[in-house]
Amino acid sequence: MATPSIKVVETPLVLYTLRRADDALVLGHRLSEWCGHAPMLEEDMALANMGLDLLGQARELYSYAGKVEGSGNDEDKFAYLRDVRQYRNLLLVEQPNGDFAHTMVRQFFYAAFADLYWRAMMKSKDSTLSAIAAKSEKESAYHVRHCSEWMVRLGDGTEESHARTQTAIDDLWAFTGEMFEADNSERALVGAGIAIDAAALRPGWLRTVSDIVSEATLALPGSDWMQRGGRSGRHSEHLGHLLSELQSMQRTFPGVRW
């Protein structure tokens, strides 16, 4: 019999921390799917390293969420023993890898946000979150540089690479707005100086994205309509497939030891 999902006491700080941890875990898992399949060996290593950076961020955030919650949940339980509706990650990060251009555009959109986010979170009044932010910002800065180089290389490359990258931008753009939204519980943490106002990051994010997209001879969509729902547990079918693979061992053999 499969292991049942855990119950989580979602106080504002626990929920806020889990949302960021879920972003990192899900996107890190997506990048791990490229292992052995990247277009060149060097990029195979780069994608794996970025995935490991994100996994490290997820572990620290899950551990802190468990400490704050105080009900015995830890990083493994949060990762392996929650169902789809309990995950609160952005819809952007759960989107399938698609081709290499699609993966790079998704990573670029997220990394450009994460770099600004972690830089701002270094000023959080929560000492644990500010410490996690200091480490994560250094990693995110590298991710932005790496992805920016690929955006320009692909966009200003061959006719096919340009077309594939533009298609990826068009497909993923509607998932970017969710990064800058907040609910009442998050706004309360902003007021307390624990969280940061994500909406205030959008102008800086848009400048970074617009500059790189322009340099890559690509274009951003004109639509303002955005997808949302991930932060409240309403996900695409893609996350269910991802979690089925990610959680299969622990769900089938709970507490297994090697």
Task: Place the predicted regions along the sequence by residue.
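Amphipathic, well-ordered alpha-helical segments in soluble domains
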Residues: D23-L31, Q57, L61, Y110-Y117, ...
